A protein has these predicted regions:
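A feature for loop-to-transmembrane-helix boundaries and adjacent hydrophobic helices
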Residues: 1-291
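Arg/Gly-rich low-complexity intrinsically disordered repeat tracts
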Residues: 293-304
Length: 304
């Protein structure tokens, strides 16, 4: 565990901040590459990224403050303190803020929401995988005690002071679990992108995969300051993950119903058109036979 990547005198380069910067750059690069394949302009991606990063950081902080409201209500001066700034934030807070911003952005720029989000979510998955490595180095988002041989023991006093991670105790490396999970999701999304049937499939797939993975991983988390609901039955992120899964189910049901109605309408329209064409052809054949009989009758008649 190395909270600081570089320390020279009084200068300290935080490992978490460094990994976050790498995640942002890697995410922008990936989004630009994917956007080119489907006709999304690179300049648009860069403009969007310059705004959404700030929005996501603010959203992550806001949800962090909400989940720890009992503390911040008693210490309101800490809301804008340097200590709060160093805490990072809650992923879903940043994601939801970015999502609402994206809805506004695509309306203003008059582009498809589904196409845009299909381009963006692989970058989100990759960025999360990289950022969680920074979490591991800083000691935040640590796991519960375990006897598993792959458990990790943290020993850095600075990390303990900053994040509260227990020292000298074997813990689940939940940061690495989530990093591996989101890296796998990233690979699935890259494979899926050129094979999708509809715009929005990749976006919805990401939401479902991450929500399911995050819901399960939360059971292994040991940090108690991430917020809970329903008398500690679910963490804040688990509750949001369930809402996301419910929302995705609703979208798929809506798509299935409306897709079936559209297919039925097309089928009925095709049947009607076929009947009209068939009737017209039958009429033409009948007229043709009538004309042929009349012609033969005229040929067989004798002049008086």
């Amino acid at each position: 565990m190395h909270p600081y990547l570089i320390s020279i005198g009084s200068f300290h380069l935080p490992t978490y901040g460094t990994m976050l910067a790498i995640a942002v750059l890697a995410g922008i690069y990936t989004a630009i590459r994917l956007g080119r394949r489907v006709g999304v302009d690179s300049a648009l991606i860069l403009d969007y990224s310059s705004w959404v990063i700030l929005v996501a950081l603010i959203g992550a902080k806001v949800l962090l403050i909400i989940t720890l409201w009992s503390y911040y209500r008693a210490h309101p001066e800490e809301i804008f303190s340097y200590a709060t700034l160093k805490l990072g934030g809650v992923f879903y807070g940043g994601f939801l803020a970015a999502l609402f911003f994206t809805i506004w952005y695509v309306r203003v720029r008059k582009i498809s929401f589904w196409k845009m989000t299909d381009v963006l979510v692989p970058s989100v998955a990759l960025g999360t995988a990289i950022t969680r490595l920074g979490c591991f180095s800083a000691g935040c988002d640590y796991g519960k005690p375990t006897t598993a041989p792959w458990g990790v023991i943290f020993s850095n006093a600075l990390a303990h002071e900053a994040t509260g991670v227990p020292l000298g105790v074997r813990l689940h490396p939940t940061q690495l679990y989530e990093s591996a999970t989101t890296l796998a999701i990233f690979a699935v999304l890259l494979w899926w992108s050129p094979r999708k049937k509809h715009d929005g499939d990749v976006f919805l797939g990401y939401l479902g995969l991450y929500a399911a993975g995050r819901f399960l991983l939360e059971y292994l988390r040991g940090d108690e300051n991430r917020g809970f609901v329903f008398h500690h039955l679910l963490s804040t992120s688990q509750f949001i993950a369930l809402l996301v899964l419910a929302g995705i189910s609703g979208v798929f049901i809506w798509r299935r119903v409306h897709g079936s109605e559209k297919a039925s309408a097309l089928s009925e329209g095709s049947s009607t058109e076929f009947s009209q064409v068939a009737g017209a052809n039958a009429g033409q054949r009948k007229n043709s036979r009538g004309n042929h009989k009349a012609k033969r009758k005229m040929q067989n008649s004798k002049p008086v």
